[in-house]
A protein has these predicted regions:
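C-terminal catalytic-base region of ester-bond hydrolases, centering on the histidine
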Residues: 141-216
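Serine-dependent carboxylesterase/thioesterase catalytic core
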Residues: 4, 9-15, 19-20, 24, ...
Length: 216
């Protein structure tokens, strides 16, 4: 289906994954008439700042005028890092709406536990350690941003943090997903991994792109 509107959605994957991981999102967005694209980046060996610059350059090259962003986990905080660094001043482009899914915005207990040991730091990679080393950036004024958290406590994160305080999605606590300045915050009964394959999640993302609000 060809896009029915002059709008694109850039989908950004999380740690240890590639653009293939956001394929379900991308297909749903294309079906809804958006020109959806998946952005891939090396999540372990590359710095957060470098990936943020590459994300901005990727979005600026798209032919559509209005650009929305959808990010999962590390991909979600990468989007915020890009916006905070560059404030999205791209000639001929308009920043659309932003949906962060399972973002460890306030840091992550799982990540902090892993970062205490050398092997854990290798597993986390540079970008996550960059994020944990500094306070969360301020979301620029005017950005229409929605957050989706999960409350199904199933995931590998519970191995690194067996005493993870509920509610959480098996990797990220709901409290860690709070973003100051967000327009909307919604918790759904999905795990951290399920977010990438959930029709309910994509329906809510599309509602936010279209109306600037989740459906309740």
């Amino acid at each position: 289906m060809s896009p029915a509107r002059d709008e694109a959605v850039v989908c950004v994957h999380g740690l240890w994954l590639s653009g293939f991981a956001t394929g379900f999102w991308r297909r749903r967005f294309i079906q809804a008439g958006y020109a959806a694209q998946s952005f891939s980046y090396p999540t372990v060996r590359q710095s957060l700042k470098t990936s943020a610059r590459q994300l901005a350059e990727f979005a600026a090259e798209l032919p559509q005028r209005r650009i929305h962003f959808a990010g999962h986990s590390l991909g979600a905080v990468l989007i915020v890092a890009m916006l905070a660094e560059r404030d999205w001043h791209v000639p001929g482009k308009e920043l659309g709406r932003v949906v962060l899914v399972g973002p460890p915005f306030q840091g992550t207990d799982v990540g902090r536990n892993l970062a205490r040991v050398a092997l854990g730091r290798v597993i986390l990679g540079r970008a996550v350690q960059d994020w944990l080393a500094h306070p969360p950036p301020v979301v620029p004024l005017g950005v229409e941003l929605g957050v989706i958290a999960g409350s199904r406590p199933v995931g590998m994160g519970r191995i690194a943090a067996p005493n993870l305080v509920p509610p959480h999605d098996g990797t990220v606590r709901v409290a860690e997903t709070r973003v100051e300045g967000a327009r909307e915050h919604l918790t759904l009964p999905v795990s951290h991994t399920e977010m990438l394959m959930s029709a309910r999640v994509t329906q809510q993302m599309l509602a936010f792109f279209e109306h600037g609000a989740f459906t309740r």
